[in-house]
Amino acid sequence: MESSEVMIMRIIQTAGKRKSAVARATIKEGNGRVRVNYKPVEILEPEIARFTIMEPLVIAGEEILGKVDVDVKVEGGGFMGQAEAARIAIARALVEWTGDMNLKEKFMKYDRTMLVGDSRRTEPHKPNRSTKGPRAKRQKSYR
């Protein structure tokens, strides 16, 4: 291949966070393959996490999904935190890839946290009864 025929491949990388889970999505031209931690999304377990990850793909539609490959690497947190972090990363990547404000509007109308993220975090435990949680009190007895 001559130097004048160099093919430029478009690659977009985005990130999503949920609780302590961090997902990094890479999207490039392809034929619709979606992988999470090197596994096809179709075989992910549990099922509820798979459906959560698939939401932005279903909303975007086959015409967009058929043209791209999505690879997501997720670490930290529990399985639902990871699934929601992956969902955020995929949604952001698809919006950036298409540059379509209608798609962004669809995502925002369906669920705002798909693009914006959810800032809620667990409350730190307080010193009094630290193992019981942040607001645990001794049971009060009137007799």
Curated annotation (Swiss-Prot):
One annotated GO molecular function: RNA binding
Q: Which InterPro entries match?
A: Ribosomal_Su5_D2-typ_SF, Ribosomal_uS9, Ribosomal_uS9_archaeal, Ribosomal_uS9_CS, Ribsml_uS5_D2-typ_fold_subgr
GO BP: any one term: maturation of SSU-rRNA from tricistronic rRNA transcript (SSU-rRNA, 5.8S rRNA, LSU-rRNA)
**Region called Disordered, residue ranges:** 118-143
GTP-binding is among the record's keywords: no
**Keyword Ribosomal protein found:** yes
Q: Name one GO cellular component term.
A: cytosolic small ribosomal subunit
Kindly state which keywords UniProt assigns to this record, in alphabetical order: Ribonucleoprotein, Ribosomal protein
In which domain of life is the source organism classified? Archaea
Q: Which Pfam families match?
A: Ribosomal_S9 (PF00380)
Where in the sequence does UniProt note compositional bias of the Basic residues kind?
127-143
Family membership noted in the UniProt record? Belongs to the universal ribosomal protein uS9 family.
Recorded hits in PANTHER family, A to Z, give: RIBOSOMAL PROTEIN S16 (PTHR21569:SF16), RIBOSOMAL PROTEIN S9 (PTHR21569)
Question: Which HAMAP family does the record cross-reference, listed alphabetically?
Answer: Ribosomal_uS9_A
**Name of the featured protein:** Small ribosomal subunit protein uS9
